[in-house]
């Protein structure tokens, strides 16, 4: 378990890899709005992962998040790089990465700060059971 709080990003750092999953990378506000509208139309719960390429815990939890996106196709898994979308991320009051928001019909129903795999799995499973 862990989280990162602020660090300057170097240009050499790679993006976080969500290989093998069904994670949608959000690159701008319009893309976010489109995905939220799509999820609402389809009745899907959105799990939004605010992370950063330089954040070690974000990199550790990424394969878990990707795997969950395969296990729970009834949800929409999104990821937002806080450095690429600084203003948008600030509007969500991100204080540490990773931060996960759970949204139903566009409204926040839960939140998790940090790369706490057991807690993330518990929250996602609970949402799956209640859906």
Curated annotation (Swiss-Prot):
Localization in the cell: Cytoplasm
Active-site residues (renumbered): 55 (nucleophile), 58 (nucleophile)
InterPro entries: Thioredoxin-like_sf, Thioredoxin_CS, Thioredoxin_domain, Thioredoxin_H-type-like
Keywords recorded for this protein, A-Z: Cytoplasm, Disulfide bond, Electron transport, Redox-active center, Transport
Domain of life of the source: Eukaryota
This protein's GO CC annotations: cytoplasm
Matching CDD domains: TRX_family (cd02947)
Residues in coiled coil: none
Annotated PROSITE patterns: THIOREDOXIN_1, THIOREDOXIN_2
Ranges where the Thioredoxin domain occurs: 3-129
Keyword Disulfide bond on entry: yes
Family to which this protein belongs: Belongs to the thioredoxin family. Plant H-type subfamily.
Record's function text: Probable thiol-disulfide oxidoreductase that may be involved in the redox regulation of a number of cytosolic enzymes.
Protein name as annotated: Thioredoxin H4-1
UniProt source species: Oryza sativa subsp. japonica (Rice)
Lineage: Eukaryota, Viridiplantae, Streptophyta, Embryophyta, Tracheophyta
């Amino acid at each position: 378990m862990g989280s990162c709080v602020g660090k300057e990003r170097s240009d050499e750092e790679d993006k976080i890899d969500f290989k093998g999953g069904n994670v949608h990378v959000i690159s701008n506000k319009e893309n976010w709005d489109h995905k939220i509208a799509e999820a609402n139309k389809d009745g899907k719960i959105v799990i939004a992962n605010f992370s950063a390429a330089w954040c070690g815990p974000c990199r550790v939890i990424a394969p878990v998040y990707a795997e969950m996106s395969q296990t729970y196709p009834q949800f929409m898994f999104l990821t937002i790089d806080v450095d690429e979308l600084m203003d948008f991320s600030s509007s969500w009051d991100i204080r540490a990465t990773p931060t996960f928001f759970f949204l139903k019909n566009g409204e926040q129903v839960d939140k998790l700060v940090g790369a706490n795999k057991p807690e993330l799995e518990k929250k996602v499973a609970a949402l799956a059971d209640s859906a």
